[in-house]
Amino acid sequence: MTRTSKSREGKSSTRIGKARLAEMIEEATVDAYDESEQATGWFTMFEEHLELPFETKVLGTAVTVASIGLRGDYQIVAICTRGRDRQAISLVDLPLPSPKPAGAEWIEAYRHWLGGR
């Protein structure tokens, strides 16, 4: 279940229910028996569901999240660009814009999964 609520500032935010988070985690990690397979499962979910590119701010600077990458250490990163500059930022640390892009609930599920391992 996805819930939409209003913050004190009147902005809406979407929260995913625990049952839906569990379903998403299961979908991303089904048949994944090691860290490499789990990372590949999550990466696949982002490729299928996350609408790219999208704009956000990193340290107060506007950037474009152009793509998602998978590092050799199995860390999933957002490839952020600004002009000719590129920077990989962990999805765990990536600030999401408001409103969030379509598919951003997969980032929330990924963060939840990482916190529970």
Walk through the language-model features, giving the residues of each.
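Mixed-charge, Lys/Arg-rich low-complexity intrinsically disordered regions
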Residues: 2-53
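Long, low-complexity intrinsically disordered regions
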Residues: 7-10, 28-31, 104-117
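Short beta-rich binding modules
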Residues: 3-5, 15, 75, 112-117
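A short macromolecule-binding patch
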Residues: 85-95
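A short beta-strand micro-motif
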Residues: 54-58
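Short aromatic-glycine-enriched beta-strand elements
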Residues: 72-79
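Short beta-strand-centered aromatic/proline hotspots
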Residues: 61-69
